Amino acid sequence: MNTLQRRKTHQVLIDHITVGSEAPVVIQSMTNTDTADAKATALQIKELSDAGSEMVRITVNSPEAASKVAEIRRRLDDMGYATPLIGDFHFNGERLLAEFPECGKALSKYRINPGNVGKGVKGDEKFAFMIRTAAENDKAVRIGVNWGSLDQSLAKRMMDANLVSSAPKPPEEVMKEALIVSALESAEKAVLLGLPEDKIILSCKVSAVHDLIQVYRELGSRCVYPLHLGLTEAGMGSKGIVASTAALSVLLQEGIGDTIRISLTPEPGSPRTQEVVVGQEILQTMGLRSFTPMVTACPGCGRTTSTVFQELAQDVQNYLRQKMSIWRTLYPGVESLNVAVMGCVVNGPGESKLADIGISLPGTGETPVAPVYVDGERKVTLKGNNIASEFLAIVEEYVKTNYGKNSSKRNKGKVIPIQSL
């Protein structure tokens, strides 16, 4: 695992999950169901949790939504899911919390946007009510500032001051500073209102990668609160994945960031869980956490005109993901398993030996056999039409043998009984 130095922060306890400092970076997601539909929302939270989301944010934007939050919590508890719920409040959060006190109690964290709680004295009163409600209910708060909904009175104040400055900055730099000031001033107000410092998480979201990196570097240097990372809108498909990865990987490598959410625009027909998988893969490929056994596979070249190794690599990765909901409980540590599926003799044997389990499929013109390596040693050679099912059986047996309750994986060599296939 990556041993990079994490940024030192307060630690915030959100139910059973610790956020900040040396605690693992937490994966967060958000539903896109109508929160007023308690059944559909609870089922999507279950789906996101099964995929690996450790906290889930839900929209609380209307009396109908607020009235269903406690029911959503009960439904999840009845299904055996303790996933913390984050209430996403904008514009009318104080009214909803006042009218539906059970909503505030059922949530584990409130997300408050200081840019749209209201203006002037009235806005201050609304903010104060939400903060005091969180404190009374012993709930954490994320003060989430967004570029698109920045407090305009603050922005104007800072722009006016910049105009008369002896060394004026470009307007975009003033706006970035305004994001940071909004978050820090709001956190200061929250503490004065009675919310403990170890109940506060901050975020300053923008949509451009370079801006996000700049803002969070500065924000992280000026406070000791845990930070939630994510682009406001990353986009759709590969663009969204690349943008999120480019931004978050830089910050995480510098030790900045304690919770993350990948704000992907869902493609038609794609599962909501994709944002969870992308977040996990960012953390896992950086060596920060392990969630699911990883498959190493070569990209293919002229030596691998067959698609067999590509299909097998996909089958193995899908199989491992499907099994994790069961394996996570039965076989602690299995998430660190590494499997190699290689396409020819050039790098196949070497990569397969480095993995826990590896298979080197024949390339174009090579002998149609596939040697399997277990813990660096060649154990069996597969051939014929059942290579995929036979290899998956070997993986399954390896997991049971090396990660089962009666095994001691860390204290003895990995072994697997290879039967004649």
Curated annotation (Swiss-Prot):
Enzyme type, top EC level: oxidoreductase
InterPro entries: Dihydropteroate_synth-like_sf (IPR011005), IspG_bac (IPR016425), IspG_bac-typ (IPR004588), NO2/SO3_Rdtase_4Fe4S_sf (IPR045854)
Needed co-factor(s): [4Fe-4S] cluster
Domain of life of the source: Bacteria
GO biological process terms on file: isopentenyl diphosphate biosynthetic process, methylerythritol 4-phosphate pathway; terpenoid biosynthetic process
Record's cofactor remark: Binds 1 [4Fe-4S] cluster.
This protein's UniProt keywords: 4Fe-4S, Iron, Iron-sulfur, Isoprene biosynthesis, Metal-binding, Oxidoreductase
Entry similarity comment: Belongs to the IspG family.
NCBIfam families reported in the protein's UniProt record: ispG_gcpE, PRK00366.1
Protein name: 4-hydroxy-3-methylbut-2-en-1-yl diphosphate synthase (flavodoxin)
Name of the gene: ispG
